[in-house]
């Protein structure tokens, strides 16, 4: 399966790794294809620079060491495919849809009430309960 991570999950995995998060990441790396979008990677770098100054180099090194498929979020995004409370989250799900991602893992509650077939939207806890 192709699994995309949202920014908040990436931050947790890269800056605050724990036993469960490491297990989830290892499972994804060994059994599935990790997909990261340009929007999420850019947002990750921006958040780290703003909230965790001095960690940018570490994040860049970790990203370079990770195995993932990098997909581009289009600069022009078709609106109206789904409703989401926070418009800043629209490009994340839009990219997951157009790139045919199977699962989007996010800790963002704004995704929880979206009713779409694919990708399946799961929290890290839901993902771990199902697959680990």
Question: Across the structure, where does each feature detected by a protein language model lie?
Answer:
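Extended, non-globular alpha-helical segments
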Residues: 38, 42-66, 126, 130-132
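PIN/NYN-family metal-dependent endoribonuclease catalytic core
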Residues: 5, 15, 21-49
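Conserved beta-strand segments of alpha/beta enzyme cores
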Residues: 33, 69-70, 120
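Active-site neighborhoods of divalent-metal-dependent phosphate/nucleic-acid chemistry enzymes
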Residues: 68-104, 109
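Acidic, PIN/NYN-like endoribonuclease modules and their adjacent C-terminal/linker elements
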Residues: 82, 109-132
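A secondary-structure boundary/capping signal
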Residues: 6-7, 37, 107-108, 123-124
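Residues that mark the start of a beta-strand
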Residues: 1-2
